[in-house]
A protein has these predicted regions:
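Beta-strand elements of well-folded, non-transmembrane domains
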Residues: 13-15, 61-65, 78-82, 94-96, ...
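Glycine-rich portal/gate segments that line the openings of hydrophobic small-molecule binding cavities
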Residues: 42-91, 143-154
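Short, surface-exposed coil-to-beta transition loops
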Residues: 6-8, 69-75, 96-101
Length: 154
């Protein structure tokens, strides 16, 4: 049985694609809208020869599993070429990787944001990780849409 699960999460965010993309690229902003993230710290940056900005973060999540509140810290890398889709990579223990591609497409006066997540996880955790990631990112995009709709403190 495959250790890989894929999910696609789509939302419409009021705002121009460049503004939505720029806001999303600063992972410290996501702490305001992601239901699990409690801390974000940028730990490195690099610029690839093709102009892709690569930014590394340490992210701390808090979640409840089987009635237990757990807190864990993991690495996230965001790779953003000057234009187009961005790539994300989250590495969590034990042997969990979330590989993402995020696109920002103009839709009238708004932006359609689409995230394709490929989740690699050991069998006992696969369903939990996929469900939690999909729910958390759906809620994150809904909170982003609400924030952009009000224009509050972007």
């Amino acid at each position: 049985m495959s250790r890989i699960v894929s999910r696609v999460i789509t939302a419409t965010i009021p705002g121009r694609p460049a503004a939505v993309r720029a806001w999303y690229l600063d992972l410290t902003n996501l702490r305001r809208v992601h239901p699990l993230i409690v801390a974000v710290r940028q730990v490195g940056t690099a610029l690839a020869a093709d102009g892709t900005a690569i930014t590394d973060y340490l992210v701390t999540d808090r979640m409840v599993v089987a009635g237990l509140r757990i807190r864990f810290t993991y690495r996230v890398q965001i790779s953003a070429p000057p234009e187009g889709p961005i790539a994300t990579l989250a590495r969590q223990a034990p042997r969990i990787r979330l590989v993402g591609q995020v696109t920002f497409t103009p839709t009238g006066d708004a932006t359609t944001i689409q995230e394709t997540l490929t989740i690699h996880a050991p069998w006992p955790l696969r369903r939990l990780v996929a469900t939690e990631a999909e729910q958390a990112h759906s809620r994150m995009f809904a909170a982003m849409a609400a924030l952009f709709a009000t224009g509050a403190d972007l």
